[in-house]
């Protein structure tokens, strides 16, 4: 199953809850790849965003993720420009992941960082070792 199909396979199980089945092809050993775990949590959080863009994500990988999982989103705070949402992913063995997402509205800025030139830096051979000399 490809990524897009897996993301679309989620089923609403409550107001802010979704269930997914993670096939073995998405496993690395006994758990699911971390990026997929984070993406499933984000998928459950998106309906709480109010159309705002994702601005930050913090994900704690608590336990193995495999088979059937349920992601439940909780709206922590909604302001004029930002939304904070937590997601708990539960699997067959209990809590699998906890995530907090911040969504924010686009804001115009007088600052433009798009085309800044790269700074001048020394080559790695000319830079002092951070760890000291190696044996």
What are the residue ranges of the model-derived segments?
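Terminal targeting signals and extreme-terminal segments of soluble enzymes
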Residues: 1-135
């Amino acid at each position: 199953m490809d990524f897009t199909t897996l993301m679309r396979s989620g089923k609403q199980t409550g107001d802010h809850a979704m269930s997914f089945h993670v096939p073995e092809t998405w496993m690395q050993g006994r758990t699911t790849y971390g990026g997929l775990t984070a993406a499933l949590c984000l998928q459950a959080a998106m309906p709480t965003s109010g159309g705002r863009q994702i601005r930050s994500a913090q994900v704690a990988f608590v336990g193995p993720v495999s088979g059937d999982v349920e992601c439940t989103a909780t709206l922590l705070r909604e302001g004029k420009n930002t939304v904070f949402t937590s997601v708990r992913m539960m699997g067959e063995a209990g809590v699998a992941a906890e995530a907090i997402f911040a969504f924010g509205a686009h804001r115009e800025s007088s600052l433009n960082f798009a085309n800044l030139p790269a700074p001048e830096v020394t080559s790695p051979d000319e830079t002092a070792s951070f760890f000291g000399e190696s044996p």
